[in-house]
């Protein structure tokens, strides 16, 4: 049974990532000889959660086991409240999560510790557990139920967005309403650990999976291979032939330069082009663009002899994500002393990025001749992307 809840009130996931479409906290109840809960919900949605449990097993009935696949508070902050209702429930989790249960909630009793590859028979169901460390916390694990061929995948295969009516992939328009939010979720939450995610996906590759139950986003029963392929592509950071131009401009001069660069990209034969104003766009979306586009051009004004602060913050985030499959281009502008281009060069060197040799720095507003150079700069990136 699906007993998850929707959260349309929280505006920022983890205090950072915008939730314009909200988020679902998925939880599952396996009813049988033993009643088993899989992961919980954030405490701010607990009232509707408990109501759903009661509707299925009846008020006064017991929960025998609570599976803790992932300790992040959006899945465990309700655990003390749930244990007050079901005090005899045993918690099933791994060694690292046992320590976290104590650290977060001072829970130390009634815990069954499982290991990688261990199978636990609970009533008429068998669950095999697989550790998936750093996807995206160190204690993360998944559980596979053999008789129904169901994978309880915690945050793996998850995405942003509430489940509005339909919960299964065959009940929704996934490509129209969820694909972008799944992509952004992966890049924002899991992206830094893409190598570990790919390792986890390979570890699970031999399982016969007919149903995927993630902790966020749609449940996959019709075409589970689709979300597996999407996550595999994201974990490999497979880019598309396109370019995102991200600029930081205080008074419009750097913006005009970015427009010239984009014109050059187009004249160079590139069709998939996106321009982003860093002052109006959350890093959540910018990181998602950078992850997916083969070409990335960063243009920034200088500020206090350094990089424009919003751009500096973005580049710090980029350096954390360990992106590897992009071509980069950089340009800077300044009024009386530089700083933007110098700092961008430093980020490029530290990240060992594949950056174009042409790196432009312009004082004040670009002249007609400098605009031509910016257009040529865009053409150079287009040729690199299209392998001309």
Feature locations, PLM:
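Active-site neighborhood of phospho(di)ester-bond hydrolases with catalytic His/Asp-centered motifs
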Residues: 38-40, 62-71, 91-95, 151-154, ...
């Amino acid at each position: 049974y699906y007993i998850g809840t929707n959260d349309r009130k929280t505006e920022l996931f983890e205090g950072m990532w915008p939730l314009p479409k909200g988020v679902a906290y998925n939880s599952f109840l396996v009813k049988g000889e033993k009643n088993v809960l899989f992961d919980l919900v954030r405490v701010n949605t607990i009232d509707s959660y408990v109501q759903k449990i009661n509707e299925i097993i009846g008020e006064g009935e017991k929960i025998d086991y609570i599976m803790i696949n992932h300790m992040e508070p959006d899945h465990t902050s309700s655990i003390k409240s749930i244990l007050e209702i079901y005090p005899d429930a045993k918690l099933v989790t791994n060694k690292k999560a046992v320590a976290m249960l104590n650290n977060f909630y001072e829970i130390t009793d009634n815990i069954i510790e499982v290991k990688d590859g261990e199978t636990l028979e609970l009533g008429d169901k068998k669950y095999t557990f697989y550790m998936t460390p750093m996807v995206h916390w160190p204690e993360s694990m998944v559980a596979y139920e053999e008789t129904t061929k169901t994978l309880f995948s915690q945050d793996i295969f998850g995405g942003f967005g509430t489940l509005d009516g339909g919960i299964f992939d065959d009940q929704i328009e996934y490509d129209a309403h969820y694909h972008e939010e799944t992509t952004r979720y992966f890049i924002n939450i899991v992206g830094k650990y893409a190598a570990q995610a790919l390792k986890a996906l390979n570890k699970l590759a031999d399982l016969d999976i007919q149903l995927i139950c993630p902790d966020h986003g749609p449940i996959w029963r019709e075409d589970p291979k689709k979300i597996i392929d999407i996550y595999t592509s994201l974990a490999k950071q497979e880019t598309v032939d396109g370019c995102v131009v991200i600029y930081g401009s205080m008074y419009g001069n750097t913006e005009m330069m970015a427009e010239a660069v984009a014109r050059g990209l187009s004249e160079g034969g590139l069709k998939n082009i996106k321009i982003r104003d860093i002052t109006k766009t959350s890093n959540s979306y910018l990181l998602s663009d950078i992850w997916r586009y083969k070409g990335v051009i960063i243009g920034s004004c200088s500020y206090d002899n350094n990089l424009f602060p919003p751009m500096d913050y973005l580049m710090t985030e980029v350096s954390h994500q360990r992106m590897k499959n992009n071509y980069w281009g950089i340009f800077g502008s300044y009024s009386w002393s530089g700083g933007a281009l110098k700092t961008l060069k430093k980020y490029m060197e530290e990240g060992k990025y594949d950056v174009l040799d042409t790196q432009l720095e312009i004082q004040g507003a670009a002249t007609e001749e400098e605009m031509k150079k910016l257009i040529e700069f865009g053409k150079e990136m287009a040729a690199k992307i299209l392998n001309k």
